[in-house]
Amino acid sequence: MKKTFLLSCLMLAAMPVMAAYTGRVYVDKNKNGVFDQSEKPLAGIKVSDGLNVVETAADGSFTLPGHERERFIFITTPSGYKTFNRHYHKIEKKQSGYDFGLIPYSGRIRKNGSHRYIHIADTEIFNTENHADWVNNVRDYARNEQAAFIIHTGDICYEKGLKAHIKLMNTENMDCPVFYCIGNHDLVKGKYGEELFESIYGPVYYSFDAGNVHYIVTPMPGGDHAPGYTADDVCRWLKNDLAHIRPGTPVVVFNHDLLTYEDTFIFKSKNAGSINLNEYNLKAWVYGHWHINYMKKQGDVYSVCTSSLDKGGIDHSTTAFRVMHVDSKGDFTSELRYTYLDKNICIASPAGVMASGVLPVAVNVYSSVSPVKEVPVSYTHLRA
């Protein structure tokens, strides 16, 4: 009996210590970051510990079991809400409670779920300066055209870039939700490659909803320094995340690189199986890495690559950010918006005076921050 008891104690001691985590998701009406009794709890919000995914109860509460490789508690930010870059909490020792206050944010998503978002990639600001012009272009376009969110698909770049970029573009100073992916040059020296990224930008995989679409952020498989996460980690979480969406929900995946050149998008792992993303109504795989502007239909899925908006592409494409116009079914059209052009106008083809006395003049006009609808013109009569 004593031997049995001793063996049980040894087995328990050898097992990893994991704790249950609890919390609440609520509407932070006064934006103080604290749940007040008068504030509305939110039910049905997905919450994860990086492996397990649960949904909040009617009172906004949740309980997660935790797991051996846990680092964050994070939510799937629901459509119509935003956080100030706080869709996650780092798991701290001796802390088991984690609340999430959400702020209503519905004006930029139409009633039928259609919306637009901005995609940027490969800004690589570690060795460049004077970023204000292109950042302002993105901010002003997002405001003028009511973009639902901005996504950066990685290569921010190296320690200097990682520390600086969050100050350039975040949900608060862009007045628009800003999300980040990790790229190969964002895996830097540390205990593990993503340590610095996590300390600034949070988890390397997570999801959020906008309109009728479920958006999933996934990490670059590898890079300059070995990551602490594995394809097994991502695959296990991804299966659980997808298990909580309504069948037929349109899905878009963001990553720094393209998953496959084939028509079937299968996320593979070593020990956790695989996922055929085509079976989950995958609409697009959106990425960067190649420094080109390129879109291709692979079977039923579009792969969409966007180049650098501050430097241009290695294919000599000009500087631009991409705008995705998404309809109620998750289908989309794509548009490139060229940066550094502030209300540019150029006479293209002045012609001779018509019999009626009218002088037709064709002009080329462009603005980085909005489409041009009209150009007021005044004429001065010049005598010969």
Language-model features: where?
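Short Pro-Gly-centered beta-turn/loop motif in secreted/extracellular proteins
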Residues: 63-71
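N-terminal active-site segment of His-dependent metallophosphoesterases
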Residues: 22, 29, 90-164
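A short, solvent-exposed loop/turn motif at the edges and junctions
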Residues: 49, 70-92
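Acidic carboxylate motifs that coordinate Ca2+ or other divalent cations, activating on Asp/Glu
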Residues: 32
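Short, acidic Ser/Thr/Gly-rich low-complexity loop/linker segments typical of extracellular
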Residues: 35, 51-61
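Extended active-site neighborhood of metal-dependent phosphoesterases/phosphodiesterases
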Residues: 78-83, 90, 162-247, 270-284, ...
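Binuclear metal-dependent phosphoesterase catalytic core
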Residues: 301-375
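Conserved small/polar residues in nucleotide/adenosyl-binding loops
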Residues: 380-384
